[in-house]
Amino acid sequence: EVLIGKNYHTNVYEARGASVLGGVGICPIETSDSGSMNIEDMINQIKDDDPHYAVTKLLCLENTFSGLVQPQSELDELAKIAHKKNLKVHLDGARLFNAHIKTGLSMKQLTSSFDSVSICLSKGLGAPVGSLLVANQEIIKKAHRLRKMLGGGMRQVGVIASCGMYALENNIQR
């Protein structure tokens, strides 16, 4: 089971792909209008390994939320508690470079509490397409296999990849 903010983009606008394609249960958690998730609400939704319930394995957070930068201290605290409860923590950071510019925090500071982070190169950076999954080697290896199984590969994409590299090297501050 995945715990996720009820109004987060991944929960609302991705056609429940995790459930449909991955067989993963989704447990939406209420968030404030600014996207903040209450720690107690998150803790109360974590299920133990009981045959009556889906086992909670992942907390998915989002920064930014509807253009609003989430307080880093809140995200870090949610991740810390989730890790203590043996959950992995993923950050949907599609527009994380916007949070980087707004807060002045380094990308390392914005991401160090998470096991994996997804970043979009076309949202705010000007690349025509492309996303990054940032994680340890074990997670990346699993992601490569899943991408292959789902047909998510492209061939001869050097030109497109070079646009993403250019965006990372030149467009963050703009």
Question: What spans do the regions from the language model cover?
Answer:
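Conserved PLP-enzyme active-site core in the AAT-like
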Residues: 1-174
